[in-house]
Amino acid sequence: MDDRVHPEVRRTATEIDTMEIRGAATIADAAARALRTQATESDAADAEAFRAELRATARTLHETRPTAVSLPNALRYVLRDMSSTTVEGLRQSVVDSADEFCARLERAQADLGQVGANRLRDGDTIMTHCHSTDALACVEAAVEQGKHIEAVVKETRPRNQGHITAKRLHELGVPVTLIVDSAARRYLNDVDHVLVGADAVAADGSVINKIGTSGLAVNARERGTPIMVAAQTLKLHPGTMTGHTVDIEMRDTAEVVDDDTLADLGNPTVKNPAFDVTPPRYVDAIVTERGQFPPESIVILMRELFGEGTSEPWAEPSPRAEP
């Protein structure tokens, strides 16, 4: 890591990389707070040195999770105004933007939860995959409305994020049935909605989420079970409007099999993709803090929020051409 990056920020980057910090909204919040820390602790001598230091910090954070689009969206928001000519002016801009971003993040999830809860009826059973605070916000809001909700929770290997979801649902008073991932098709007849989160949503309405989401969506469509994706607008991937693709992160082999077992199996090649892509035709609604949208309408929302292009504040500025 760049020596200019504050130790606390390095620690945050490591925790994001190792998934100690997980969940797109949680990652975005941590990234914004890390930039704030860098800004407040910086002893840069002048404005240009301060900007370079913040770019290095943003790069360090950005490189940790290439698929979690909430991370670069958080970096863009916090570093959106770096026009001041003084260190103190720049520092204040970063601090104010980070504080505003984190406050908006908290409000957005509550608003999203209300929108999603309106799709859930009293007595409904949902099926979940992985762990999504946005999806859980929908359930929490429904419970607060007095609705009785039950849940079938996929364990979500290899890291068992479904266990986190099961624990949180239990805390909300929701009866939980925990199932192995491969049993999902069997239990789809018992559920009224599939409710998942998203790490990113592309301009065409495709949903990038934890590996296994697309297979669940295909099975749900076959069974006629509606699929609701809960995703704050910070999960929208503006780069996909201009043809950029979403990188699918490959996780460490050790998450799947330990070295001794691998050797005993004859050292086969092990693939551990963290995410997959669910085509929009398998998604019924994408629920955001700004309302619910059919997947084909997401590009309109993206244009409203981001315009036609995006900046990358972690990139070094291009050298000026000689006159």
UniProtKB/Swiss-Prot annotation:
<keyword id="KW-1017">Isopeptide bond</keyword>
<dbReference type="GO" id="GO:0019509">
    <property type="term" value="P:L-methionine salvage from methylthioadenosine"/>
</dbReference>
<dbReference type="GO" id="GO:0019323">
    <property type="term" value="P:pentose catabolic process"/>
</dbReference>
<feature type="active site" description="Proton donor">
    <location>
        <position position="199"/>
    </location>
</feature>
<keyword id="KW-0832">Ubl conjugation</keyword>
<dbReference type="GO" id="GO:0046523">
    <property type="term" value="F:S-methyl-5-thioribose-1-phosphate isomerase activity"/>
</dbReference>
<dbReference type="InterPro" id="IPR011559">
    <property type="entry name" value="Initiation_fac_2B_a/b/d"/>
</dbReference>
<comment type="similarity">
    <text>Belongs to the eIF-2B alpha/beta/delta subunits family. R15P isomerase subfamily.</text>
</comment>
<dbReference type="InterPro" id="IPR037171">
    <property type="entry name" value="NagB/RpiA_transferase-like"/>
</dbReference>
<dbReference type="Pfam" id="PF01008">
    <property type="entry name" value="IF-2B"/>
</dbReference>
<dbReference type="GO" id="GO:0043917">
    <property type="term" value="F:ribose 1,5-bisphosphate isomerase activity"/>
</dbReference>
<feature type="binding site">
    <location>
        <position position="235"/>
    </location>
    <ligand>
        <name>substrate</name>
    </ligand>
</feature>
<dbReference type="InterPro" id="IPR005250">
    <property type="entry name" value="R15Pi"/>
</dbReference>
<keyword id="KW-0413">Isomerase</keyword>
<dbReference type="InterPro" id="IPR042529">
    <property type="entry name" value="IF_2B-like_C"/>
</dbReference>
<feature type="cross-link" description="Glycyl lysine isopeptide (Lys-Gly) (interchain with G-Cter in SAMP2)">
    <location>
        <position position="210"/>
    </location>
</feature>
<protein>
    <recommendedName>
        <fullName>Ribose 1,5-bisphosphate isomerase</fullName>
        <ecNumber>5.3.1.29</ecNumber>
    </recommendedName>
</protein>
<comment type="function">
    <text>Catalyzes the isomerization of ribose 1,5-bisphosphate (R15P) to ribulose 1,5-bisphosphate (RuBP), the CO(2) acceptor and substrate for RubisCO. Functions in an archaeal AMP degradation pathway, together with AMP phosphorylase and RubisCO.</text>
</comment>
<feature type="binding site">
    <location>
        <position position="65"/>
    </location>
    <ligand>
        <name>substrate</name>
    </ligand>
</feature>
<feature type="binding site">
    <location>
        <begin position="22"/>
        <end position="25"/>
    </location>
    <ligand>
        <name>substrate</name>
    </ligand>
</feature>
<dbReference type="InterPro" id="IPR000649">
    <property type="entry name" value="IF-2B-related"/>
</dbReference>
<feature type="active site" description="Proton acceptor">
    <location>
        <position position="130"/>
    </location>
</feature>
<feature type="binding site">
    <location>
        <begin position="209"/>
        <end position="210"/>
    </location>
    <ligand>
        <name>substrate</name>
    </ligand>
</feature>
<keyword id="KW-0119">Carbohydrate metabolism</keyword>
<dbReference type="InterPro" id="IPR027363">
    <property type="entry name" value="M1Pi_N"/>
</dbReference>
